Design a protein with these regions (language model features):
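Short, charged, intrinsically disordered terminal tails
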Residues: 6, 124-143
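Short, structured beta-strand-loop surface elements
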Residues: 52-114, 120-122
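Short beta-strand segments
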Residues: 19-51
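Short, basic/aromatic recognition patches
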Residues: 1-23
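General beta-strand recognition
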Residues: 45-47, 117, 124
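Short solvent-exposed loop/turn micro-motifs enriched in small/polar/acidic residues
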Residues: 17-19, 31-33, 81, 109-111
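Short, surface-exposed beta-strand-loop junctions and turns on beta-sheet-rich folds
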Residues: 30, 54-56, 132
């Protein structure tokens, strides 16, 4: 059996801050796609960097997108998922660009120079706890 718990907005932000890779959901024309992306948080925005001229960079411009993160802890059989939905826009604010530039980045993505922020308007999350089923000995013996 699985117990399900809805998470409040504050806990969703806390969980977002614990991971560095998420899944970006957006449209390429009429086709929806899910793309794994590294990200960081800055001023209640999700910030991603992409390569100038890349298809994902074009699709991110002034779109409404979804961003999802999750994690699973084997030791306590707990999983969680957070989904944020909001508009994406190029980062042009010098303060934000400087802050993002100083953040640690994955070496594989250092050459990406297009910075986009997603400003979540909706954020929700769930925690799932897998409970070990208990088997009644009376039921086992009655077969």
């Amino acid at each position: 059996m699985t117990d399900l718990e809805e998470l409040d907005e504050s806990e969703c932000w806390d969980l977002l801050a614990q991971v560095t890779v998420g899944r970006l959901g957006l449209h390429f024309g009429a086709i929806p796609r899910i793309i794994p992306m590294d990200f960081t948080l800055f001023d209640k925005c999700i910030v991603v960097c992409t390569a100038v001229g890349a298809a994902v960079t074009h699709a991110l411009r002034d779109s409404v997108v979804a961003f999802q993160v999750d994690d699973f802890h084997l030791n306590n059989q707990e999983a969680w998922s957070v989904v944020a939905v909001g508009p994406s826009a190029p980062v042009t604010d010098l303060r934000t660009l400087q802050a993002v530039d100083g953040l640690p980045t994955d070496p594989a993505t250092r050459d990406r120079h297009w910075v986009t922020q997603i400003e979540p308007r909706l954020i929700s999350g769930r925690r799932f706890v897998q409970r070990t089923p208990t088997v009644s000995m009376a039921r086992v013996g009655s077969r």
